[in-house]
Structures are given as structure tokens and as C-alpha cells.
Amino acid sequence: MAIIAVAELVEEVSMSRVEHVLNYLKRRQLENPGFLYAIEDDCGNVFWADPTCRLNYTYFGDTLVFDTTYRRGKRYQVPFAAFTGFNHHGQPVLFGCALILNESESSFAWLFQTWLQAMSAPPPPSITVEPDRLIQVAVSRVFSQTRLRFSQPLIFEETEEKLAHVFQAHPTFESEFINCVTETETAAEFEASWDSIVRRYYMEDNDWLQSIYNARQQWVRVFIRDTFYGELSTNEGSSILNSFFQGFVDASTTMQMLIKQYEKAIDSWREKELKADYEATNSTPVMKTPSPMEKQAASLYTRAAFIKFQEEFVETLAIPANIISDSGTHTTYRVAKFGEVHKGHTVSFDSLEVKANCSCQMFEYSGIICRHILAVFSAKNVLALPSRYLLRRWTKEAKIRGTEEQPEFSNGCQESLNLCFNSLRQEATKYVEEGAKSIQIYKVAMDALDEAAKKVAAASNRTPGTRLPNGEAYPSEEARETANATNHPGGEKERTILELTAELERTGQRCEVYRANLLSILRDMEEQKFQLSLKVQNARLSLKE
């Protein structure tokens, strides 16, 4: 990523303070060309991401959190922001960092666009940000198809500040307000509850309440639960934002301390992830029932995901599923606790596809199946979780490949053919190590290599006229040479330069095609292995019946 000239930095953040960070970024890029950083012209805003950040996004880029904790209360000395998500253990995972020295709509848009370019991947399906107009507009410009959510705990925090007099005068207001926002099950129920609170406490003309009501589609649970946000819960929990740097970067952190704290946070979370990986692989959670479905979930999910599943599964013992309509292959159930039918949920079940949908939408929101669908599965004697309800991102095999760093080549391999060679060699070494673990894996690896060799050979010998990404035809080598000779008759040296440039472009494209094909094959292998493991699990469960 090209570095743009640094302009005069704003406010109290001096060049000397930022220079400490820039020197670190330059050194990291020299050590690893896959480390990217960029500086916004005229503003001095800085962005950076290492290869692990970009690899994390390929695994867990199904939702994004833009953490701007530094903006709360203007107490922070360092305007440090982070792009984060959730890994398969529910832990925060880093996608990139930024220093935001100048806040404007265009600066946030630049930052989002730069981050997206660095990820070399599609935009996230959903994003969580603090409630702020500048950020909201920038998100709509860059992530036009991404579902925007405002941090609910942040809104609660600001509501408590702006309505402190109400909280003090009316002790019941807080619980009523939270229940209205988090516990209502339909839009109509929310509207009725909100209207009741506003009228009862004479707050019809309160500007703050009116503003957050107008934005209800972006933060009230009943309106956002149909979208995946990567949290192992139907609410946002106690954290303000998914802060990867909580406990490491705070109001006392100076620019000189930032890099040290940044690296401490990365090391800490890496260690926590490794411990969670080890626990998931080498220990078995305690079963609470003799159900084969619970055992299946324990063998596939990470510990954090399994605990959430187990909570839902155990609750099925107290919520019967009652049929309210049945058309043969499609059955509708009402699922509720004994004596609480008015708080129940509706589940539609397709017996042909073994597919169910619940009005609580917990699976859509968190990726873990809800107790209501599990109760229907129990009633229909479904003993194994269908594969559609086992999101790979919550399983022990969420990371398709074991590599932690993987350079991206957004412009093919023109920047460095040596980097291409070294990257492929590193990947091949890791592939060999995995493929030599057993005879069975070796055979699979050899078959994949044979297939890869065929695809690479086909790509290398592709016919002239290959399409470019912008839809223009890529001319044949002869045509390019003719054009070079015709359009540049001014000298042999210039013609040679153009020929070498063209050859470099072709080599870069072949390198990129080879890399893409190899990655595709490896992903296919991992997906087939995952699906096979599900089939084996289901087969074992069938034998036990």
C-alpha cells in the first residue's frame, strides 16, 4: 500500500509523537512486506494491518466492530481506533488499527476504504459502531450493503448521562427502559412499551429519547436480531464495544506507550486463543444429558460455543412444543414454558428438509441454534444437528488452514516476484508438514497436488484474449509486441522496457492465478473434510439408536 506524504498534524498531536509510531510501522514493513500501512494526505490519519489481521478477516469477517473507545468523554491522549471481530471462541480478534488525528466524514470514509482495500476481501455483512453521524455517513458511503448497528451499551451509557435526573427521581425507569429495548419480541410490542414509558414519565418532548427512537432500527434488539453479529448471546452483554485493547490502551496511554501496549494486547490475545484451542482439542466438556445431539455438539463446537448451545439444549426440558397447525410436511409449533404461553415463540418446521425457523431469530443473530427449535427437534425425534445449524465459524475447525500469516498481492506479483516465490514456498512447506502426518492425509494431499498441477498448467497455457477485471480483453503477446513496436518507434531501449513490463504483468497474473487455484483447492479439501466429519458423526448416532 503506497504511503502518502504526511501533512501538518492537527491539534496537540505533534509530528515527533506520531513519528514514533511511523518508525515502528516502517520497520515492520521492512521485516514483513505483508505488513501494510497508509497515511491520509492533508490529515495525517494513519492506518495499519499486519498479515495476521488480514488472515483473521478471511476466517471471521462475517461481522465487524469499529472500536472508537477513545472518543468517549474526550479523555484519551491517543486517538487510537481498532477494527475487530470475534473468533471461534467468542474472543475479540484484530482486523486492523488506526490513529484518527482529524475527524471528518471524508476521513472516516478514507479509513474504511483503506481498510477494505487492505483486507482484499468483500465488505462485512454487518458492522457495529458508536452512534455518531460522521461514522454513520461514512459507513453508508463505503459499506453500502452492510447492515449498520449502533452499540446498544453505548446508548444505554449515554442515556444514563443525559437523563441522570430521571434515573435518580424514578428508580424503576432504568429497568423499564432496558426491558423495553431488550425484551420485547415484536415491533408492535416495542412501540407500545416505548409509548407507555414516555407518557408515564412525561418525556414526550425529550430530545434525546426522540433521537434514539428515530434510530431504533439500528440498535433495538427486535429490529436487528435478523442479522448475524457474531455474539454468543441475543444481547450485546456488558462490554461497550468489542474492545481488543481493553486493559491495554486507556486514557493514560501516551503516543510513546502506544506501540508497546499494542504489542502486549496482541500477545495476550494470541496466548488466550492458543489456550482455548488447546482446551477445545484436548478436553471434553461435562455432558448434562445422555442425548447424542449434545455429544455431537461437544465434539464439533469450541468450548465457548458449546456452552452456549448446552444452555439452550438443557432449557428444552422445560418448554414443550405444541402444534398449532399441520399441513403434512410443514408444521407450526408454539414453544413456551409451562404457564407462560403468552411469552412463547413460533417455530415453523419442514420435515422434508429438516429445517426450522424461530420467531426469536437467535440463530440468525448469534449462529447458535435456539432452545425453541431444539424443542421441536426433540418432538420430531431429530437426534443429530443438521449441518445447516452448525456454523463452521463456531467449530474447532473454523480456521480452514493453520497458517497465521498470508501475504496478499492486490496487484498480482508485480511488486515483488521474490515475495511470490517465498510465499508459495512457505505455504508448500506447511502443506507438506500437514500432508505427512498420516498415510491417509498423504494420499489426499497427493491427489490435491495432482489436481493443482493440472489447473496451474491450464492457467499457464491459457489462450490469448483473457478477460481483465474491468471487462477489457487482455491482448495476446504478439499483439502487444506489435503495438509496442508501432506505438514506440523512438528507441530499442524503450521498446525493451515495455516488453519487460508486459512480461512482468503476465508473470504476475500467472502467479496470482496459481495462488488462487491452490487456495481454492485447499479450502475445498478442508470443507470436504468438515462435511465428512459431520456425516461420520450422524452415522455413529444412527448406529446407537
From Swiss-Prot:
GO-annotated molecular function: zinc ion binding
Describe the location of the MULE domain by residue ranges: 66-150
Where expressed (tissue)? Expressed in hypocotyls, rosette and cauline leaves, inflorescences stems, flowers and siliques.
Enumerate the residue ranges of region (Disordered).
Answer: 460-495
An annotated GO cellular component: nucleus
Q: What induces it?
A: Up-regulated in hypocotyls by far-red light treatment.
Main localization, broad class: nucleus
Annotated compartments? Nucleus
Keyword Transmembrane helix, does the record have it?
Answer: no
Q: Which GO terms describe its biological process?
A: regulation of DNA-templated transcription
Enumerate the residue ranges forming zinc fingers (SWIM-type).
345-381
Is Protein transport a UniProt keyword of this protein?
no
InterPro entries per record: FHY3/FAR1, MULE_transposase_dom, Znf_PMZ, Znf_SWIM
Q: What family is this?
A: Belongs to the FHY3/FAR1 family.
**Job of this protein:** Putative transcription activator involved in regulating light control of development. May act as a negative regulator specific to phyB signaling.
Q: Could you identify this protein by its name?
A: Protein FAR1-RELATED SEQUENCE 9
